Amino acid sequence: MKSIADTGFIVAFARSNDQHHLWALDLGKRITEPLLTCEAVLAEAAFHLGSSSYVLSLVEDGLLRLAFDFSENLGQLRELARRYADHKPDLADLCLIRMSELHPRHAVITVDEADFRVYRRNKRETIPLICPPQGN
């Protein structure tokens, strides 16, 4: 499964009391290759979990792989920030939108379906998503 990991998935995977924990665990069992992500997502996840060490271990253990160069994509990130200014996307979301453009065969794993249904890659393409079932 070729995918890009958002913060909410990582937090749900780690926290047994998260409403999406069982979904994240089930999905995690089916992952056969590292999930791509970016530093902004790792920083958010470490903040929400209160543990940089746990997030670092996910990278060290090969569940997550950093696959984004912020500096090389600064112009595109700035354009995305302008395009979605009314939605006030955080930096991690902007990076994930751009990663989806760079890795078009990858779906974004997120619990934040509402925002990602609004965002578009390459200006008009919907971003393929893997989300928890409705009501979960």
Give residue ranges: language-model regions.
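PIN/NYN-family metal-dependent endoribonuclease catalytic core
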Residues: 4-5, 23-51, 62-69
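Alpha-helix/helix-capping structural signal
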Residues: 8-9, 40, 114
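Acidic, PIN/NYN-like endoribonuclease modules and their adjacent C-terminal/linker elements
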Residues: 104-136
